[in-house]
Amino acid sequence: MTPRYFKEYLARYTYAKDGSWCYEDGCVYRGLALLHDQQPQEIWRDELLRLIGPQVGEDGALAGYTQDEFNIDHILAGRVLFFLEKPAPGAHWSLAIEHLAGQLTRHPRTDGGNYWHKKRYPQQVWLDGLYMGLPFQIEYGLSRNRPDLVDDALAQLNRALDLTHVAATGLYAHAIDEARAQDWADPQTGLSRAHWARALGWLAMALVDVTGLIGPEKAASSGLPERASALLTRIAALARPQSGLWLQVIDQPELSGNYEESSASAMFAYALMKAARLGLGHQFAAPGLKALASLETTQLYAGDDGIVRLQNVCEMAGLGGFGSRLRDGSPAYYLSEPLRPDDHKGTGALMMAYAERLASASAEARRAAS
């Protein structure tokens, strides 16, 4: 049922930002690339080319994108450009990569050395941004023989983990304001208040992706495997006992109105299964598999129009002013954000998790045969 859902979703696909380059489409693109790696005979790469083709000009210009916006979110979709560059090199893919890498060379940094989340969010580091920017920088550094960029990305990731870790919960805050200037930031620590599941999902995926990219030796020296294992152990413990999914405000099951959120659950499923495949802990496979199966059986269903969609996906959440809203980072705030079936972030993450289940099964079959 799940591959059929993906194909029907792609057939009715609408760009997240009217065709402008953005991370939301990038989540789906990343999912398609991973699906192609496991099922090269399928339509996934053709669909990716159909969707991304109109967004990348012959000169590498990206639709609606400007470097000087300094939005770290815009970097994420660039990861798929490395995938497209490998089997069929095209100058425009490489030129587009350079446009995005050029942003990072000039992107503002906090006083501590981390990328600002966005130009309009000065001195702020969000967990979301760790996934949006740092794996791309590592892939760029590895493919362009720039070990300095790999080391810088690893230093940023470890520094962000140090800054956002909350010892009392064993989790990480959604964001830190190093300037201690934002209303949502604790005046002493600079941290936001509540633990939003999808923010932790972005982080979990960043940790396993980076660990996989840099290889066992460098991963061991970076300390990331231990940090990933500690986080995923805590995440696995917070899964709801019956469904195996995770709550929007992940550590507050008693909170009225809290609900099982699909995008974060798919991200955790992906991260847990990949962690097991990478050798970070065999115990992570079972909760990852359970979560994906639960998403497939309980969150993929038809609405009144008869179309099967991924349900219970939080459309967006953030911190600080956004239009007329003041997003204060409280548990109540995260529960106030609307749900959007088939949101790109949810379906993209589900594609990643489904592909990872295939990758993990293939790896296990190879081990059994050896």
Positions of PLM-derived features:
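Acidic/serine-rich, low-complexity amphipathic helices located in mid- to C-terminal regulatory regions
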Residues: 128-143
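Long, well-ordered core segments of solenoidal/helical folds
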Residues: 1-17, 46-63, 95-114, 147-173, ...
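Oxyanion-binding "anion nests"
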Residues: 204-253, 257
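His/Met- and acidic-residue-enriched segments that coordinate or traffic transition-metal cofactors
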Residues: 9-19, 160-163, 169-177, 182-192, ...
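Short linear capping/connector segments at secondary-structure termini
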Residues: 114-121, 175-180, 246-254
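CBM-like carbohydrate-recognition segments
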Residues: 1-26, 33-34, 38, 43-45, ...
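Inter-helical turn/loop segments and adjacent helix faces that build the functional surface
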Residues: 39, 88, 140-151, 210-222, ...
